[in-house]
Amino acid sequence: MVTTTPENEVLTSTSAVTGLPQKRYYRQRAHSNPIADHCFDYPARPEDVDWRSLYPSIRADQEVSFADIGCGYGGFLVTLGELFPEKISIGMEIRVKVSDYVLDRITALRQKSSGTGAYQNIACLRTNAMKYLPNYFRKGQLEKMFFLYPDPHFKRAKHKWRIINQALLSEYAYVLRKGGLVYTMTDVEDLHNWIVTHMDEHPLYERLDEEEANTDPITPKLYQSSEEGAKVVRNKGDHFLAIFRRL
């Protein structure tokens, strides 16, 4: 079994060429039931989170401002860390082996970049964001939230499990500051239409028009920075983008 290792230990299951962990040692089912009773440790309130355990170099005046919900294997999270070195980004992932991989990947990147300070601004939490998001973030804390290629839950009976729904949108609005942005990307048109419908119906969001969405410097990175996005590109699949502003 692969476990997370401290930064000063040698990583197992690591490529001799890249020095990074290899995904084949961290395989897991593509999706996890978010309604099931997983065993999670979670804080009672945001003030109880020990962020320094995840970000050893974080300054007293810094806090998490970007959240990649369902970050998968961390490709986009790493890109965020590179694009915004002064911002603190967190990836949240429910699957244990996948979150272990992201943690080990970040540890390896920090070791390879030792002395530069790179990748000290990203981290990953294994948690269920559909249940515990307000336990980690105070009201209006986040600037940006990302929902990239979420589980479409195709069966109608499972639509209630979708990461975008009316109840959860109110929770996202609570932790998102006014003017903050929600980025969504999927290769499933039905899910895209579901997202747009629910976001449009919620009084605390407005959709960015096409021009504003396409001029956002993050937009080009949404297509293939994540492993799932890169797979869609390889398979010549469709991408459906929608970005919303918190009112």
UniProtKB/Swiss-Prot annotation:
EC no. given is 2.1.1.33
Q: Which GO terms describe its molecular function?
A: tRNA (guanine(46)-N7)-methyltransferase activity; tRNA binding
Catalytic activity reads: guanosine(46) in tRNA + S-adenosyl-L-methionine = N(7)-methylguanosine(46) in tRNA + S-adenosyl-L-homocysteine
Q: Where is the signal peptide?
A: none
| Pfam families to which the protein is assigned, alphabetical | Methyltransf_4 (PF02390)
What pathway annotation does it carry? tRNA modification; N(7)-methylguanine-tRNA biosynthesis
PROSITE patterns noted in UniProt: SAM_MT_TRMB
Q: What subcellular locations does the record give?
A: Nucleus
Q: Which GO terms describe its cellular component?
A: nucleus; tRNA methyltransferase complex
Where this protein primarily resides, as one coarse class?
A: nucleus
Q: Which UniProt keywords apply?
A: Methyltransferase, Nucleus, RNA-binding, S-adenosyl-L-methionine, Transferase, tRNA processing, tRNA-binding
Domain of life, source organism: Eukaryota
Residues noted as binding S-adenosyl-L-methionine in the record, renumbered to the chain: G70, E93, I94, N128, A129, L148, S226, E227, E228
Annotated catalytic residues: D151
- Return the similarity comment: Belongs to the class I-like SAM-binding methyltransferase superfamily. TrmB family.
- NCBIfam families for the chain: tRNA (guanosine(46)-N7)-methyltransferase TrmB
> Could you tell me what this protein does?
Catalyzes the formation of N(7)-methylguanine at position 46 (m7G46) in tRNA.
* Protein name in the entry: tRNA (guanine-N(7)-)-methyltransferase
Origin organism of this chain? Drosophila persimilis (Fruit fly)
